[in-house]
Amino acid sequence: MATRTESKKQIPPYMKAVSGSLGGVVEACCLQPIDVIKTRLQLDRVGAYKGIAHCGSKVVRTEGVRALWKGLTPFATHLTLKYTLRMGSNAMFQTAFKDSETGKVSNRGRFLSGFGAGVLEALAIVTPFEVVKIRLQQQKGLSPELFKYKGPIHCARTIVREESILGLWSGAAPTVMRNGTNQAVMFTAKNAFDILLWNKHEGDGKILQPWQSMISGFLAGTAGPFCTGPFDVVKTRLMAQSRDSEGGIRYKGMVHAIRTIYAEEGLVALWRGLLPRLMRIPPGQAIMWAVADQVTGLYEMRYLRNAPL
């Protein structure tokens, strides 16, 4: 009977996917400027930017306000697709980890489901989209006609032509490690905070207020950046580099990049851009979960609260 009850009360994966896609659109529009600043700081090897505020003001002063939304199209598209896949695949993985007797998912199952969803999104969506986004964001100046890449599609075509299709998957290894770890921690923590703070259990028909979802999402999104900082820096460096005139590249892979950055710039450089990540990821999770929880909450209220047992 317990299993039958749980199956009646379960939110289907497609609804999780829809909720994630809507949350991704809102998050992208709100937080793109922070992502641009983070990328510029991580690519700054000569100290051109003195910090977040200086970087942002310099970008606006030298390139215009619109420059803070450079790469928005691939960023918004990538976030929407990423959250659709993340939320949907995580729900499917959790179904596989459900206890056959109680129908519940353990913290271990939740952690592994999140890691699997993070790995899947990293390989299928995040890596190629972030390669294009970072290449666009690193272009500096006020004259677009002088840019190497004219837009997302032109950028992708140029990378494929000059570096082969594999160029779109530059930095795949650190991206997999970053996203897998981030989502494992995030999904586990979000569920724990919902229960601890609001006594909210999935399938109970209770809809969290947006501010409650934002608090849980914000707290759940804080741990990842500290754990995955080096992977994010290495990912950005690998994605930003292109082959020189002789066909060579600066970083040969994830391990070589970590060693090179540590040797040339010091240990702290592996956490460069941490503050803007903390300014972007926890608020991003707060925004995304505020939207996603409303969508799934309405579904619970309409279809699950009075579902027959």
From Swiss-Prot:
One GO BP annotation of this record: malate transport
Q: Which UniProt keywords apply?
A: Membrane, Mitochondrion, Mitochondrion inner membrane, Repeat, Transmembrane, Transmembrane helix, Transport
Outline the Solcar repeats, range by range.
11-96, 108-196, 208-298
The membrane topology of this protein is:
Multi-pass membrane protein
| Compartments, record wording | Mitochondrion inner membrane
What are the GO MF terms of this UniProt record? succinate transmembrane transporter activity
Instruction: Cite the Pfam families for this sequence.
Output: Mito_carr (PF00153)
Tissue expression notes: Expressed in root tips, cotyledons, hypocotyls, leaves, trichomes, stems, flowers, carpels, anthers, pollen and abscission zone of siliques.
GO CC field: mitochondrial inner membrane; mitochondrial membrane
Chief localization: mitochondrion
**Ranges annotated as spanning the membrane:** 17-37, 65-85, 111-131, 171-191, 214-234, 273-293
The record's similarity note reads: Belongs to the mitochondrial carrier (TC 2.A.29) family.
Record function comment: May transport cytoplasmic succinate, derived from fatty acid oxidation, into the mitochondrial matrix in exchange of fumarate during lipid mobilization in seed germination. Conversion of seed-reserved triacylglycerols into sucrose is necessary for growth before the onset of photosynthesis and involves fatty acid beta-oxidation, the glyoxylate cycle and gluconeogenesis.
The protein depicted here goes by the name Mitochondrial succinate-fumarate transporter 1
Q: Which organism is it from?
A: Arabidopsis thaliana
